[in-house]
């Protein structure tokens, strides 16, 4: 009943992950404005055909053809994405025909997405891009199938454990970060078995990995927390692998070490269960789970726990799952787009402040 991410935005992000140089939105100039502006900070040129009221009646394929040609003249792109919107798809615009007429010497992926595509889940927009990319040989068929499987599992998690459960969820900003930070530090100093779990999605991991670089050894040298993370640098598209490699390097430079790798940064729907098994085997008593904490079956573990999420509408579902404490990081996408190194998080700052107080 509340607004949720759009398939159009997911199409844009997935084209970015494929290293598209230019993305053209075939629709009104305000459609997906925020996402388009954010992606510009990540090195992608986002253009629009700026459809108007008259175009809704008579069509705007000529505008798309012209925009494609101008885009090539300005940027000489190797890969261009053309993404449909509600306006262009409702009137039946033929994106592929306009692309053929443009005749630019670049690879062009035409994606007939819109706000209600499929069942309206944002992952539908990502899936249609992956299918088109595999069809054109941009990515292997097996890689597309793997990612589509992950996206479908992610949708299932959101519908059963997250903010897409079909009811109105009141936004909340979670517990006081300083109070929760003190509770984490007390657990380490008391000698309890503590683990930090990164189960994050793509570039948002630059924010959620911040807590993995802190000097916890100064609190209790004989009881450093265990670090578990979905940072396999051999899984995913090249851009996603680079994110994992960058973060692992920074963690190592901080003097900390990732003891357990659960999978890749696009495998968060399944790495939560793997992390839970490690928590059981390591007999962990206190866990801090960051990124997509609702993908980890905390209700099966019987431990004190902290969920660190980026969604105000995920706070209440996470409490319902059994997390002892929940804190929210705002604007994770906006803060991490275009980043190539770890970004300081609000909860990380709370931990830093309180480490200084207790030492």
Curated annotation (Swiss-Prot):
<comment type="subunit">
    <text>Homodimer or monomer. The Ni-sirohydrochlorin a,c-diamide reductive cyclase complex is composed of a NifH homolog component CfbC and a NifD homolog component CfbD.</text>
</comment>
<dbReference type="InterPro" id="IPR017675">
    <property type="entry name" value="CfbD"/>
</dbReference>
<dbReference type="InterPro" id="IPR052673">
    <property type="entry name" value="Ni-siroh_cyclase_CfbD"/>
</dbReference>
<keyword id="KW-0547">Nucleotide-binding</keyword>
<keyword id="KW-0436">Ligase</keyword>
<keyword id="KW-0411">Iron-sulfur</keyword>
<dbReference type="GO" id="GO:0005524">
    <property type="term" value="F:ATP binding"/>
</dbReference>
<dbReference type="InterPro" id="IPR000510">
    <property type="entry name" value="Nase/OxRdtase_comp1"/>
</dbReference>
<comment type="function">
    <text>Involved in the biosynthesis of the unique nickel-containing tetrapyrrole coenzyme F430, the prosthetic group of methyl-coenzyme M reductase (MCR), which plays a key role in methanogenesis and anaerobic methane oxidation. Catalyzes both the six-electron reduction of the tetrahydroporphyrin ring system and the gamma-lactamization of the c-acetamide side chain of Ni-sirohydrochlorin a,c-diamide to yield 15,17(3)-seco-F430-17(3)-acid (seco-F430), the last intermediate in the biosynthesis of the coenzyme F430.</text>
</comment>
<keyword id="KW-0408">Iron</keyword>
<dbReference type="GO" id="GO:0015948">
    <property type="term" value="P:methanogenesis"/>
</dbReference>
<keyword id="KW-0484">Methanogenesis</keyword>
<comment type="similarity">
    <text>Belongs to the NifD/NifK/NifE/NifN family.</text>
</comment>
<dbReference type="GO" id="GO:0051536">
    <property type="term" value="F:iron-sulfur cluster binding"/>
</dbReference>
<dbReference type="GO" id="GO:0046872">
    <property type="term" value="F:metal ion binding"/>
</dbReference>
<dbReference type="Pfam" id="PF00148">
    <property type="entry name" value="Oxidored_nitro"/>
</dbReference>
<dbReference type="GO" id="GO:0016491">
    <property type="term" value="F:oxidoreductase activity"/>
</dbReference>
<keyword id="KW-0479">Metal-binding</keyword>
<keyword id="KW-0067">ATP-binding</keyword>
<protein>
    <recommendedName>
        <fullName>Ni-sirohydrochlorin a,c-diamide reductive cyclase complex, component CfbD</fullName>
        <ecNumber>6.3.3.7</ecNumber>
    </recommendedName>
</protein>
<dbReference type="GO" id="GO:0016874">
    <property type="term" value="F:ligase activity"/>
</dbReference>
């Amino acid at each position: 009943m509340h607004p949720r991410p759009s398939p159009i935005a997911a199409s844009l992000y997935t084209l970015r992950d494929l290293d598209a140089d230019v993305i053209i939105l075939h629709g009104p100039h305000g459609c997906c404005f925020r996402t388009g502006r954010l992606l510009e900070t990540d090195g992608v040129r986002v253009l629009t055909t700026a459809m108007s009221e008259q175009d809704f009646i008579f069509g705007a394929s000529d505008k798309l053809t012209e925009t494609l040609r101008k885009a090539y003249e300005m940027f000489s792109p190797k890969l261009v994405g053309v993404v449909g919107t509600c306006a262009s798809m409702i009137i039946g615009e033929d994106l592929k025909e306009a692309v053929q007429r443009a005749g630019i010497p670049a690879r062009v992926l035409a994606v007939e997405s819109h706000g209600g595509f499929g069942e309206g889940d944002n992952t539908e927009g990502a899936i249609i891009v992956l299918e088109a990319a595999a069809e054109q040989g941009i990515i292997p068929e097996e890689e597309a199938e793997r990612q589509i499987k992950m996206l479908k599992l992610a949708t299932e998690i959101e519908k059963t454990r997250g903010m897409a459960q079909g009811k109105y969820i009141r936004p909340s900003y979670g517990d006081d970060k300083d109070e929760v930070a003190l509770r984490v530090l007390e657990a380490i100093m008391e000698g309890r078995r503590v683990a930090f779990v990164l189960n994050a999605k793509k570039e948002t991991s630059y924010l959620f990995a911040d807590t993995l670089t802190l000097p916890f050894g100064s609190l209790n040298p004989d009881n450093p927390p265990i670090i578990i993370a979905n940072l396999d640098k051999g899984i995913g598209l090249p851009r996603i692998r680079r994110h994992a490699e960058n973060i692992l390097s920074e963690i190592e430079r901080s003097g900390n070490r990732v003891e357990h790798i659960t999978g890749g940064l696009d495998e968060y729907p399944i790495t939560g269960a793997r992390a839970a098994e490690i928590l059981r085997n390591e007999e962990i008593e206190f866990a801090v789970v960051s990124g997509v904490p609702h993908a980890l079956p905390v209700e099966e573990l019987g431990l004190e726990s902290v969920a660190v999420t980026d969604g105000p509408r995920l706070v209440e579902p996470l409490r319902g799952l059994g997390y002892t404490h929940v804190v929210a990081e705002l604007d994770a996408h906006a803060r991490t787009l275009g980043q190539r190194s770890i970004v300081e998080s609000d909860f990380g700052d709370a931990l830093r402040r309180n480490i200084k107080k207790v030492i």
